[in-house]
């Protein structure tokens, strides 16, 4: 069965269309893999084998009839942030206990319309708030990677840790994810997978549980750049139900792979050389520059002067929006309800019991920065900084830069329950230092595996592009992937 689960989406699609394998055989292989591994990795919080088999049988019928969709018969994992009709959708929070939506998110509906098969719902940080997948009500996800000679459990990154771990461990062919401040790209870098955060508005947010509405964007995590391109083409669409989705044609991203980089300008921002950055991250960055130069791209130094303000501004804007979005969870119509002496007491007890520690922290930060006397000092200033960050990128792109190359993360994956990080949330927030600028500016960004550190753990590079120019990111990331090779964890589970 492992030979089936080792197929990329592109390879599986080819074999399915040639009738060398069936969608049901492929799905059964993944169900068996999940049964064997999930007790060790905790990547899935809900597996849907009966539904998966039914969808696979329907795919086989369409393939036989010559009516195969772009993703016909491809088994996928779905982050628990996406509404799936009649299937557990809780954003990995206790406060949404038992919630099964009567509607389907636009992103997942697009995937099913193209013939994809749902294997189940993937673990994540509660309400997508976290960088390690340790804030989930269902417990931490364990990274399938381990340092050489060590049995220490490592985090897969967050908030899309379940998505990244499942893809890396071959527990799905690909996965949906979301990115508010780095939640696709950081887990991808930590697990040796490819993750792209598209331009804000490229994918509909309808039916996706909101964290910070002006920052949230759905995207795929996949085993390689080609698979990520295939998935994004299906996920992306304009949607009348989401006024922030943009009415632009969705290109054939896969067609961009293999195109020449000759004549392209790649910007290298000096501000991303942060204090205390490990030498191996700097070395990897230099290696990425050399690969792109060898492929014919011109390397130019650029300045993004407001980068240093991005993280503090993000941790004002995102919690402010979260405090508003999460006000709707009160125990009245769905989810957890803790009885109280009156309705206000019920609200308080339900929210106290239902939200985890990190979610409560961010709600309180958001409420504080929006309160009278602090709104101008914090929230308005953070939005002004956001405008300046966006302008920095616009100036770089207007000067002729086609894409920007940076590290994806300041380190490789760290240990589960790291006391140093647990005692100081700001240290955990620093994991987003290279990724939040992209969300603040609404730009596309892709993380691609580029090497291993001294401990044998994956490291990634990030490419940032112009608005709605994901094609350039795919073709450039493909060059890095071809040079670096692909990385798969040694199986220990």
UniProtKB/Swiss-Prot annotation:
Keywords: ATP-binding, Ligase, Nucleotide-binding, Protein biosynthesis. One of its GO terms (molecular function) is ATP binding. Heterotrimer of A, B and C subunits. The lineage of its organism: Bacteria, Pseudomonadati, Pseudomonadota, Alphaproteobacteria, Hyphomicrobiales. One of its GO terms (biological process) is translation. GO terms for cellular component: glutamyl-tRNA(Gln) amidotransferase complex. Disulfide bonds: none annotated. This is Glutamyl-tRNA(Gln) amidotransferase subunit A. Pfam families: Amidase. The active site is at 79 (charge relay system), 159 (charge relay system), 183 (acyl-ester intermediate). Signal peptide: none annotated. It comes from Rhizobium leguminosarum bv. trifolii (strain WSM2304). The gene is gatA. It catalyses: L-glutamyl-tRNA(Gln) + L-glutamine + ATP + H2O = L-glutaminyl-tRNA(Gln) + L-glutamate + ADP + phosphate + H(+). PANTHER family: GLUTAMYL-TRNA(GLN) AMIDOTRANSFERASE SUBUNIT A, TRANSAMIDASE. Its EC number is 6.3.5.7. Belongs to the amidase family. GatA subfamily. InterPro entries: Amidase (IPR000120), Amidase_CS (IPR020556), Amidase_dom (IPR023631), AS_sf (IPR036928), GatA (IPR004412).
């Amino acid at each position: 069965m492992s030979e089936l689960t080792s197929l990329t989406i592109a390879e599986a699609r080819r074999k399915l269309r040639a009738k060398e394998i069936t969608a049901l055989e492929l799905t059964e292989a993944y169900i068996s893999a999940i049964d064997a591994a999930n007790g060790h990795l905790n990547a899935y919080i809900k597996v849907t084998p009966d539904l998966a088999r039914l969808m696979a049988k329907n795919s086989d019928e369409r393939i036989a009839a010559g009516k195969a969709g772009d993703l016909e018969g491809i088994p996928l994992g779905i982050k628990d942030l996406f509404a799936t009709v009649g299937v557990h959708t809780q954003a990995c929070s206790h406060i949404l206990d038992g919630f099964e939506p009567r509607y389907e998110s636009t992103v997942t509906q697009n995937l099913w319309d193209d013939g994809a098969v749902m294997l189940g719902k993937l673990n994540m940080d509660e309400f997508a708030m976290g960088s390690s997948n340790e804030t989930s009500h269902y417990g931490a996800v364990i990274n399938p990677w381990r340092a050489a000679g060590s049995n220490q459990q490592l985090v897969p990154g967050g908030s899309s840790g379940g998505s990244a771990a499942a893809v890396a461990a071959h527990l799905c062919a690909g996965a949906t994810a979301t990115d508010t401040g780095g939640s696709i790209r950081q887990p991808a870098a930590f697990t040796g997978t490819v993750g792209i955060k598209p331009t804000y508005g490229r994918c509909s947010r309808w039916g996706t549980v909101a964290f910070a509405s002006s920052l949230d964007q759905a995207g795929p995590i996949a085993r390689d750049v080609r698979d990520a391109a295939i998935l994004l083409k299906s996920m992306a669409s304009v949607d009348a139900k989401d006024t922030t989705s943009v009415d632009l044609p969705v290109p054939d991203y896969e067609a961009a792979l293999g195109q020449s980089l000759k004549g392209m300008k790649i910007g290298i921002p000096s501000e991303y050389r942060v204090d205390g950055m490990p030498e191996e991250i700097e070395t990897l960055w230099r290696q990425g520059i050399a690969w792109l130069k060898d492929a014919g791209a011109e390397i130019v130094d650029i300045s993004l002067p407001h980068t240093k303000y991005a993280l503090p501004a993000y941790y004002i804007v995102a919690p402010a929006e979260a405090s508003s979005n999460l006000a709707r969870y009160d125990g009245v119509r769905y989810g957890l309800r803790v009885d109280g002496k009156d309705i206000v007491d019920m609200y308080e007890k339900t929210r106290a019991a239902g939200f985890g520690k990190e979610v409560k922290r961010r709600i309180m930060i958001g409420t504080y920065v929006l309160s009278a006397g602090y709104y101008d000092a914090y929230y308005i200033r953070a939005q002004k900084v956001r405008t300046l960050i966006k302008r920095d990128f616009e100036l770089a792109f207007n000067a002729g830069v086609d894409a920007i190359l940076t590290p994806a993360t300041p380190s490789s994956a760290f240990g589960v329950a790291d006391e140093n990080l647990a005692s100081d949330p700001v240290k955990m927030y620093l994991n987003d230092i290279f990724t939040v600028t992209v969300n603040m500016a609404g730009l596309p960004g892709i993380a691609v595996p580029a090497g291993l550190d001294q401990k044998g753990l994956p490291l990634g590079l990030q490419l940032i592009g112009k608005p709605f120019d994901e094609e350039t990111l795919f073709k450039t990331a493909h060059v890095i992937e071809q040079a670096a090779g692909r990385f798969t964890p040694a199986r220990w589970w």
